[in-house]
Amino acid sequence: MKPKVRFFDLQPYGDKFVVRDPVGISQPFIATPELLFLLSLMDGTRDITDLQAEFFKKTGHLIPKEEINQVINFLDENYLLYNERFLNKLKEEREKILKKGYREPSHAGQAYPENPQELKNFIEETVNKNSEKFKARGILVPHMDLRVASGVYGSVYSAIKENEYDTVVLLGVSHYFHETPFSVLPLDLRTPLGDLKVDIERVEELQKMFDYDLSHDVLAYKNEHSIEFQTIFLKYLFPEVKVIPAIVSYGDTKSLKEIAHKITKVLEDSQNPLIISSVDFSHVGRKFGDPHSYDPSPRDREYINLLAELKNEEAFNLLQSDNNRTRIDGQFTNFVFLEILKNLGVKEGKLLDYDVYHEAPTDSKVSYAGMVFY
């Protein structure tokens, strides 16, 4: 047997690490650096004898084969090995979600109130801003913690709450395992205020334009807050609207333009579509691999100015030019977002609000903004 560990996420935890499953099938566990090194050797090319020898060669410590076998069994039991057992479980979980017919809210009662009346009060307080109103065709909103970023959420949704929309294209990012470049969730979105209906006719029409299954990455939506956080505002402000929930995961400018063109195509008979990009901006500091935090606003402003002018290629190239050094979120999502808006005749965008959250214990910062496009 030559075990192959599948992809997982790591988060520092003192002198150890929390190992998290980006697919959401397995429970997190604590791992030492030594264990992580052993896991890194499990790439499908080594059997137990090879693993023992390579670990000894690099560390000078001889692990008994029985212990290595225990680790392999633990990984297998928790579907953390890339093998037939994991693939069957993945298929089973996908089918389970699709069969259910709707996406359960995973953050209700934690990030926002689960009680309907309390949630209504929370949203009403958030969107009760006397801000300038816009007949916006597109909005860029954070997916930052609702309690932290309520002011920015409020700036945007207050600006459009008097509008009417018949279809919403909700573009998020994936914080979890996502194989395909682009996916669509063909399910209603349950909220404490009722179900936000999926625009299933347009979703099915969109699927016909792609040569891969757009629901293949349905598991990525299970805990995805970039989708969920917008649903509560949409259900409250536009209760009858239908939604196309989607994630843009990766792509080059050519393929991203093709995605945008296809989305635009299914909106041809929509009288009042709204396009949403649910993204945050820079992620800097020790939590994200920097030696310390720093002010990301100069870089953010440069990027925001390009977004406001709908210069998606320039904005994309700016981030690509230095490997997105401040880790601005949603570069692929924003490219598709702006391309759709240009296809719909939108001419300009405006920054309504911008802020930076500083997490003192980890000396890390996350920036976020609210914009309207019209």
Swiss-Prot record:
Protein name: MEMO1 family protein aq_1336
Signal peptide coordinates: none
Organism: Aquifex aeolicus (strain VF5)
Family statement drawn from the similarity comment of this UniProt entry: Belongs to the MEMO1 family.
CDD domains: MEMO_like
InterPro entries in the cross-refs: MEMO1_fam (IPR002737)
Highest taxon of the lineage: Bacteria
